[in-house]
Amino acid sequence: LVGSEMCIRDRSPKRKVPCICDFTQIASKEEVEQLSAEELEKRIFSAMEYDEYRWQYENHIRIASKQRAKNIHRILYKCPTCGTEFEMDSTGTDVFCNHCHASWHLDEYGELHAKEGETRFKLVSDWYRWEREEAIKEVEEGRYHFEDDVRIEHFVNAKVGFKKLGIIHMTHDEHGYIFDGTLDDGTHFHLEKPCYETRSMHIEFDFKGRGDALDIATLQDTWFVFPLHSKNQLMKFNFTTEALYFKTVEKK
């Protein structure tokens, strides 16, 4: 399915972009009986890979919105010019770095143009893949570590919604996700999500207008945690969570 992300991304106004869905048989009945689980998984993951920005560019899909770059810094959090993380911002048709002041224009067909100097990444997806490679390198070299105080909320049920529990401390590194602290009612909260159990992380940008959130779940409960001091960290969590998972699994 291509086109959907261009329509619903957290930007306004809404865009009228064609959506195209292709149905593909990944494996026949006979292949399912013969192939290993690993090979079937590989085929599924391969079939689910797609690049909306390249699709837009190659098919000349025009997005004329004057706000087409709004919030794109949520994805493009690292500056390719100075290497600074979490100082990117965006408005209108531009994305820019608040640290070194490098700036790029996003044209109507999804191509990026540096306002000064050479354009290192022509497409948003190329920039995104570079960020992922940088995050993986950081994990592999043992340099990755994150910590911050977070507001934790417990999802009670669909009728009641979320209940605020208090402020605790969160760390994320080769030990996995660790949440620890004293809740507002005086009880101690401690939860660990080891790397080998966490292949991916569900993130929510500005969840219900209450801030960026991570969805932490067990078989019994669901909590949303909101980092209090770090900004625009969510996309990097996607990369580092996956990288830490594979690094840990390969060691076992």
Stretch-by-stretch model annotation:
Residues 1-7:
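Short, small-residue-biased leader/transition segments that mark boundaries at the very start
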Residues 194-252:
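Acidic, Ser/Thr- and proline-rich intrinsically disordered linker/docking segments
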